[in-house]
């Protein structure tokens, strides 16, 4: 009875631990402006945007759990300083946005972000897709729909089923988790160059997830960072490594 009760608790409460959505609303940082992303299912989502300087690519960023537009600004400070276009996506149900978080909902949010860039005549081959943690799931989903220039995954998981199953191994998570974000099954289908970064001290998503994703991807480079934890995405060293990798691709 206790086992069944705990399984039911995980099933019915999973949105709370998969999507711990902060509600703080942040003003755009200098150089950014607030814009609206209109989703196909009728939501108007606030995002932050800075246009690219002439000849520079544009990066679309999907932040991690408990993240925000303010944090995403810090995660991409180096790119903004170098003149890249940057679109910081805020999900449905996060940061004062309407809607309820879900994998399919986040997919629609990502599509709205790419549509926003298309409206501004930004070519797919000038777009870099980037995701941290839970944002890696939407980044991978978008990489399968957009022929972008590159994909960057920071502290990604193979799937939420794998991740939660590692932390609570006594339950059949494949039957319980309804938001799988199955990066491992999808990433090999991505046609663009892929960079996976992970910290060796990540206690939230173990580095084994990043290694597994990199091993499965035909065009994937893996970078490990000794002693860095799950929030390595804010680290200037990590951002510099991203920029160096992009420069090698001519981006």
Where are the regions that the model predicts?
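An N-terminal hydrophobic leader/cap segment in hydrolases
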Residues: 1-38
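Membrane-embedded segments
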Residues: 40-120, 137, 143
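Alpha/beta-hydrolase fold nucleophile elbow
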Residues: 121-133
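Hydrolase active-site cap/lid region
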Residues: 136-192
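Short beta-strand/loop motif that positions the catalytic acidic residue
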Residues: 189-191, 196-198, 202
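Conserved alpha/beta-hydrolase "acid-adjacent" motif
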Residues: 203-209
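Catalytic histidine-centered segment of alpha/beta-hydrolase-like enzymes
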Residues: 228-238
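Catalytic active-site module of serine/aspartate enzymes centered on a nucleophile-bearing elbow/loop
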Residues: 236-251
């Amino acid at each position: 009875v206790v086992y069944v009760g705990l399984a039911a608790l995980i099933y019915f409460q999973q949105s709370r631990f998969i999507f711990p959505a902060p509600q703080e609303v942040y003003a755009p940082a200098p150089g950014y402006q607030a814009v609206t992303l209109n989703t196909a299912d009728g939501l108007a989502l606030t995002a932050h945007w800075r246009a690219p300087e002439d000849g520079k690519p544009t990066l679309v960023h999907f932040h991690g759990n408990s993240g925000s537009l303010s944090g995403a600004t810090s995660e991409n400070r180096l790119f903004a300083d170098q003149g890249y276009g940057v679109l910081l996506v805020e999900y449905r149900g996060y940061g004062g946005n309407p809607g309820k978080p879900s994998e399919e909902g986040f997919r629609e949010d990502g599509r709205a972000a790419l549509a926003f860039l298309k409206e501004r005549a930004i070519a797919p081959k000038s777009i870099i897709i980037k995701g941290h943690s839970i944002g890696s799931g939407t980044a991978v989903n978008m990489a399968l729909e957009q022929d972008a220039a590159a994909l960057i995954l920071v502290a990604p998981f193979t799937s939420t089923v794998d991740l939660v199953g590692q932390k609570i191994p006594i339950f059949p998570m494949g039957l319980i988790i309804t938001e799988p974000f199955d990066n491992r099954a999808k990433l090999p289908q991505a046609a663009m160059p892929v960079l996976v970064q992970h910290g060796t001290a990540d206690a939230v998503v173990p580095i084994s997830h990043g290694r597994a994703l990199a091993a499965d991807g035909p065009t994937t480079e893996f970078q490990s960072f000794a002693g860095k934890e799950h929030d390595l995405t804010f680290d200037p060293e990590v951002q510099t490594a991203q920029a160096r990798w992009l420069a090698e691709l001519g981006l």
